[in-house]
Curated annotation (Swiss-Prot):
Function: Converts heme B (protoheme IX) to heme O by substitution of the vinyl group on carbon 2 of heme B porphyrin ring with a hydroxyethyl farnesyl side group.
Enzyme class label: transferase
Protein's name according to its UniProt entry: Protoheme IX farnesyltransferase
Topology with respect to the bilayer: Multi-pass membrane protein
Membrane-spanning residues: 22-42, 46-66, 89-109, 116-136, 143-163, 170-190, 212-232, 234-254, 272-292
Single Gene Ontology MF annotation: protoheme IX farnesyltransferase activity
UniProt pathway annotation: Porphyrin-containing compound metabolism; heme O biosynthesis; heme O from protoheme: step 1/1
Similarity comment: family membership: Belongs to the UbiA prenyltransferase family. Protoheme IX farnesyltransferase subfamily.
Reaction catalysis annotation: heme b + (2E,6E)-farnesyl diphosphate + H2O = Fe(II)-heme o + diphosphate
Residues spanning the signal sequence: none
Length: 294
């Protein structure tokens, strides 16, 4: 039976399939991209339509991820309560749900935004749900690096929605998230390394050890600091962003150094939590600077 029943509990289960907390951060970055794409305020109709369309396709991609990794999720404490890991939603139901919301998202983007945004968002869906989840994640410890582009695309999707174009500035935003992703995710993988070892996924701390992973977190953090200077260097942002990102970077570097030289699971956990705050505040600083630049 593949009927999508509408009881409150069932709705909550389908909502959980979309990984709402992860989706919220992705859509937040997309919305910031919309505002950065124009010196004026973007059309509220475009902002609303693009937000809905991108959210729906992101949710569809995460639902496929939950489907593919349901057995792996059931073996990990962090993910064992996901609906598919608990057998609360079937494979056919998930496929129907993902197809419905993904199709709806494409329809919204094509009809109310522009075809470029629709195709870019669909390509991002394929990149995450297929290339990363099905092909790369179970095959290589560099999965998060190679497959990170799909997760880094939201600001470019937002930019394309408003400008119908992807200039250098949009790709700088993508690059920031692309470089941010490995230290963010590897911090999680470090303190969850035993769970990942049981799952069978070739995560970097499992295949190459904790010290190797700690060192690469440090390397990517240095690269991240350099990358986050680009908006100011190319004239995309001003002093508000520069001061804000300098403070954010100093804290990120401190956490990365602690993970590298004085590792504990607790400091890795704190770095992971901070990395989410870091990205949110960085994009918020870009937005404030965009309209209040001096």
């Amino acid at each position: 039976m593949t009927t999508l029943t509408a009881s409150p509990n069932r709705i909550a289960q389908y909502w959980a399939l979309t990984k709402p907390r992860v989706t919220q951060l992705a859509v937040f970055c997309a919305v910031i991209g919309m505002f950065l794409a124009t010196p004026e305020l973007p059309s509220w109709k475009i902002v609303v339509a693009a937000t809905i369309g991108i959210w729906l396709l992101a949710g569809a991609a995460f639902a496929i991820n939950c489907l593919v990794e349901r057995e792996i999720d059931s073996r990990m404490a962090r993910t064992a309560r996901r609906p598919m890991a608990r057998g609360e939603i079937t494979v056919p139901q998930t496929l129907v749900f993902s197809g419905l919301i993904g199709g709806a998202g494409m329809w919204v983007l094509y009809n109310f935004v522009n075809p470029l945004t629709m195709w870019l968002t669909f390509a991002t869906f394929v990149g995450y749900a297929v290339i990363y989840t099905i092909i790369l994640k179970p095959a290589t410890p560099q999965n998060i690096v190679i497959g990170g582009l799909s997760g880094a695309m939201p600001p470019a999707l937002g930019w394309a929605a408003v400008a119908n174009d992807l200039p250098m500035q949009a790709w700088i935003l993508v690059l920031i998230i692309f470089i941010w992703t490995p230290p963010h995710f590897w911090a999680l993988a470090l303190y969850r390394r035993d769970e990942y070892a049981k799952s069978g996924l070739p995560m970097l701390p499992v295949t190459h050890g904790t010290e190797f992973t700690q060192f690469h977190i440090w390397l990517y953090t240095i690269a991240l600091v350099a990358t986050t200077m680009l908006p100011f260097a190319v004239g995309m942002s001003g002093l508000i962003y520069l001061v804000s990102v300098a403070i954010l970077d100093i804290i990120f570097v401190w956490y990365a150094w602690q993970v590298y030289r004085h590792y504990t699971d607790m400091i890795a956990r704190k770095m992971f939590a901070y990395s989410i705050i870091y990205l949110s505040l960085l994009f918020a600083a870009l937005l404030v600077d965009h309209y209040l630049r001096f």
